[in-house]
Amino acid sequence: MEALGTGRDRTSQASATESLDLRRLSTRADSAYSSFSTASGDPETRTPSPGTERLPYLDWDYVRVVWGSQSPTSKDAVLSTTQRPVQAVAGHSDPRSPEVQGSPGPLNRQDTPLLYALAAEAEATAHTAEPPSPPASRDAYRQRLQGAQRRVLRETSFQRKEFRMSLPGRLRPAVPTRLPTAHVRSASSSQELGEEEPARTAVPALAAAGRGRLSSQQRQCCFSEPGKLHRVGWSGGPTGEDLRKDYSTQELQRGMHAKSKGLLETQSLSSTELNSGPADLGNAHRPAGRSQSVSGEVMGPCKGSERTVATVQAVPQRADIRRPLLHTKLSRSLTQKEVTGVCPGEALQTKPAGCGRRISETSVSTPGPSLPEDDVFLREAKTPSPQDSQGLPTSTSYRQYENDLSKKAGQIAVSAERPLHETPGITGTEDCGQAVNGSVDLSRPTSIPETTNDDIPTFDTNGTTDPSAATEKKPLKPPPVDVLRPSDSETPGSPHHTSLTWGQFDSKTTWPSRHFEALVQELARLDPSLSRTLAAQPGPEPPQGLLDGLFPVEEIRSAMRPALEEMGEKAAGASEEGSCGHHLTQDLQTSQEASRSENSTPDPDQSSGQEFPEGNSTQAKKVELARLLQKMLQDLHAEQERLRGTAADWTQRNGALEAAVSQACTPRELERFRRFMTDLERVLGLLLLLGSRLVRVNLALARAGSNSDPDERASLLQRLQLLQRQQEEAKELKEHVARREQTLRQVLERELPAEHLRSYCVLLASKARILSQQRSLDDRIRFLKDQLDTIWSDLSHHPLSPRLTWAPAIRPLNKQPFLATLI
């Protein structure tokens, strides 16, 4: 029994051994099996039965190891086991056996069980002599495994189409955690990540304390979600409490991250967000070597005393940070400048110094002929060496930057009533923030750089574009009257108020009628639970100057002037006949603006004619408001379909122009044209998305005021700084796209006739307008649907009035029809 106890540890090791080496056998095995020697040709004598004697090389422990017995066997069993191995061994005593004549090979458990057991004992002894792996080694292996899992999740995570602008995630180098001058290791090389992995695992550890505290409503009400930021400034309610509770956890985590400056920014994706939120856009460190474009073109190495600079920002993991709009790793920009950005005055004056850090920079690079402008997305962000950057400004005002652009490039306004060459003679007599027919056009006076406009300009979605076709068989059609138009705030007289108008909405809520406004105010007074929904506003539009400098204004004006002169008199006559409905401001009116013009005076049957019962007046007013919202949604859907048709027409005209370019230009120039028109849509979408989110945060800051929750305000300021860094990256990208367009336009001016060149200019202007209108329509439709769903949910939880019946024609999708009053 003692032998069985001592050999228990060797059982699993011996049974798990698949191939054993004869050289590791003990001397007892050599003496007991000396007949296996090649020098001995005599057959081995049979080993007698041991009986009650215990052989030195055969005991109960060995028998248990070989045959897997868990308890001592009987005497008969021992006899049978001692005879079976001998017979097996005798069978191998033949001199012709390869096991004997050749070199020692792997042992077989069935053929030589005792020899197998002895070898297992030697193997177990050798394993026992090896020291166990220390805990530090196991921890390092676990950290490497976790790092590999994070890289797999990062590379296979969901990405929006608007953000996939360059290299895939598996090719983006990681930000260095220690020295910014060291080259970035590839994210796919797991051999050299031993130093970085411990730092990366610290980020999830910090957020572990706050895990599970976020409610579903709090996750959805992020700062970048359209239509939800209007709730931030209100005190009380579950939304404000959740936000304050969420930020208290994030503030603690952010304080811990501030102590370790080498941590990576943790980015998460939200599948419930329409466009996903912003993220930090610091300049990722990239080696100054050769880079390869998406199309396969390889660029030359960076020369001179230029180096790359990395910006690392620690962000709480539970904070709702999305993947960056223009990730620095894929930022394909040349320069980096620091701007303060557009925000309310009190927002920047009171923002804490520790909310964020940015690397100020500096180098403004001119378009270089050595690198093709088609690869604008592929050019690395470079900053000069410290000795070269001394004495340069470190900060630039955003408004000053916009004013410089406006002075340099100028702005134009085109309409059907006035030809384009008459634009310098117009003057502004109304405030640039005044709304006309429910929409507003904002023009920036370039003669007063110090002027600040607190009104937030927006993009008009009331109009659409109808670009002219460019084919070889028929001449170019005159540009439509709704492509470019003067601002409504401009009248003839002054040359300072000129603007390239893309179409804009007023940022303030425009009620369709006085009856609608009175109905909303009355319901907010009668039912405070609906005040938050009724007081909300649709998402703001991007600022006006966001697209300034992207297109050459003067060149577009000169190219389109002949066509506008030809159609000037016809358009002016049409406007004199009262065809103001064809004006761009009224071409794409939202249902709110249409109702406002149609219902400028309340109808008797709508305002005073309907006398609801006193006991059910609140419910009847909700029904009436639901009917109005449903009608507005129907009008917006109709305009959305018409805008889709306009976009399809733009695609057709672009194809006709591409066919003309393919016949007149070389294949390389044709490829340049195709890539530019494809990238133009992505760049415009990114600029509009970034601008609208920046305005949304500014509105939330202005609404919150100085008496709001400090944690809430600090969180908004942190979000604002992230957006400002993204805005700086977007400005640099816009400058590169503008240089790329200039190079392409020079080729087209040399190769294409005048009518095709005019068509190209019209396509550029109309594409920006179509995208801005689509974004505005989608946002307003989503906003009205939220209001309609809230009112419908409130109506479904109240008993029906006997004077209310169902209206089959007015009902939301997948729901029962709304109630309508019996008049």
Curated annotation (Swiss-Prot):
Record bears the keyword Cytoplasm: yes
Positions of region (Disordered): 1-55, 72-110, 124-159, 181-200, 270-303, 349-375, 420-503, 566-620
Record has Acetylation as a keyword: yes
Biased composition (Polar residues): 28-50, 72-85, 444-468, 489-503, 586-620
Span of domain ASD1: 145-233
Family stated for the protein in its record: Belongs to the shroom family.
Protein name: Protein Shroom1
Name of the coding gene: Shroom1
